[in-house]
Amino acid sequence: MASNRFQNLQNWTNKHVFSNSLDYWNQELNEVPSYQNQPQTGESGSNPPPHDRLEPIQESVVSEQPQKDDINKQEEAKDDGHGEASEPISALQAAWNVTNAIQGMFIVGLPIAVKVGGWWSIGAMVGVAYVCYWTGVLLIECLYENGVKKRKTYREIADFYKPGFGKWVLAAQLTELLSTCIIYLVLAADLLQSCFPSVDKAGWMMITSASLLTCSFLDDLQIVSRLSFFNAISHLIVNLIMVLYCLSFVSQWSFSTITFSLNINTLPTIVGMVVFGYTSHIFLPNLEGNMKNPAQFNVMLKWSHIAAAVFKVVFGMLGFLTFGELTQEEISNSLPNQSFKILVNLILVVKALLSYPLPFYAAVQLLKNNLFLGYPQTPFTSCYSPDKSLREWAVTLRIILVLFTLFVALSVPYLVELMGLVGNITGTMLSFIWPALFHLYIKEKTLNNFEKRFDQGIIIMGCSVCISGVYFSSMELLRAINSADS
């Protein structure tokens, strides 16, 4: 009964909501290649692509059911929301990608983590890096059986563990990506309000979101890559500025200000914030698959996480030792000189604006690959018209997605609490619990007792961090909301 209702709803939406009637061309055109998969110049459009590449989805009115092999190919086409590279990448390039993911915008909040958690926060920065490195290794091991690659994505690993479990992984990935977009809005608004307090935070969020509506039209990974490149440049500039500024006050530092005192109410939020900053597992399978020499993956991942841990510890300590009790949620807001603060904050705002398109694009691709490739492969019709342009309703849905991130940001405009809550939910699942759980299930027959205990230990630790973190982070968020209302 429920399946019939879903089928009726699906048919109705395909006919009336995601309708081809918006197109003015002849809808009887068959075998039109999709927007994302045009053949290269000189290639024959009749030759099918290899089975492990994303296949064109044909716009067709033919009503016959697809063959089982075709459905399997469509399943293989779905990835983690990140497009494949046009050519294999080196270990150094892979390390750069991982470093960008875990050394991102949110390091500006590390000094406040040291202020709140002291040496416990510093220990978390090192410990979480260690665990995330090992769970990344475990996740990649789940792709192989007897040295042969059997699976390609995080979702395929989850579905092998339990059919249908991959949907939970996709939901966590989507939550992680959209949460990242939301936090960029909160961060940009915080920085702008500190520079120009005549406009409140909500106003700056709306202004920032208006400029980000153009992301709704992004459909070229090359453009997203260029934006990410400029984002990396701005990241290096602002980090260099802040490190040099902090080093100029080295004579005033006092390491005794970093305490061992433990506040059980705030520490789980800080740990979640640290976990959120190390989450890169959603694209590790794709990254490993695109390396020229996948055997170098473990070494690459190890040194990437070592570098990240060292930099995060140093940056967090430098910021707190320089500003002490005056340390703000964003380190640049701690700067005493207003003109200098405006300069640094504006660079950070540009970085936030350049950072938003990548997770947004990945979220859009995730939704497209699982909902909008075309019926019957996915529940709804394709986002693209036969002339390879994006349909009007698809653009509208993307605009709604941008507005959704704005709505959530307006509802919970609290940077540290939001990062902590997201890290304790999706971060612990994607980076702690699931990789160890899947590895224990898939490799159980080949693991020795120590390796089994190691996986079980990570699962127990991840569950403990998740449960306690969600509770205390939620309490911290509620306190922040109540404090703002009073």
From Swiss-Prot:
Coarse class of the primary localization is membrane
| Residue ranges that the UniProt entry lists as topological domain Lumenal, vesicle | 115-119, 189-203, 250-263, 327-341, 420-421, 479-486
Give the membrane topology, semicolon-separated if more than one: Multi-pass membrane protein
**Annotated transmembrane regions:** 94-114, 120-140, 168-188, 204-224, 229-249, 264-284, 306-326, 342-362, 399-419, 422-442, 458-478
- GO CC, any one term: dendrite terminus
In which residue ranges is the amino acid composition biased (Polar residues)?
Answer: 29-46
Renumbered to this chain, region (Disordered) spans 29-85
User: Which molecular function term from Gene Ontology is one that the record holds?
Assistant: glycine transmembrane transporter activity
Name the glycosylated positions: N337
Which N-terminal residues, if any, form the signal peptide? none
Q: Which stretches face the Cytoplasmic side?
A: 1-93, 141-167, 225-228, 285-305, 363-398, 443-457
> In Gene Ontology terms, what is a biological process of this protein?
neurotransmitter loading into synaptic vesicle
Where in or outside the cell?
A: Cytoplasmic vesicle membrane
Q: Which Pfam families match?
A: Aa_trans
Q: Does DNA-binding count among this protein's keywords?
A: no
Keywords linked to the UniProt accession: Cytoplasmic vesicle, Glycoprotein, Membrane, Neurotransmitter transport, Transmembrane, Transmembrane helix, Transport
Spans of biased composition, class Basic and acidic residues?
A: 66-85
Record-stated family:
Belongs to the amino acid/polyamine transporter 2 family.
Summary of the function given for this chain in its UniProt record: Involved in the uptake of GABA into the synaptic vesicles.
- This chain's protein is named Vesicular GABA transporter
Q: What is the lineage of its organism?
A: Eukaryota, Metazoa, Ecdysozoa, Nematoda, Chromadorea
UniProt gene name: unc-47
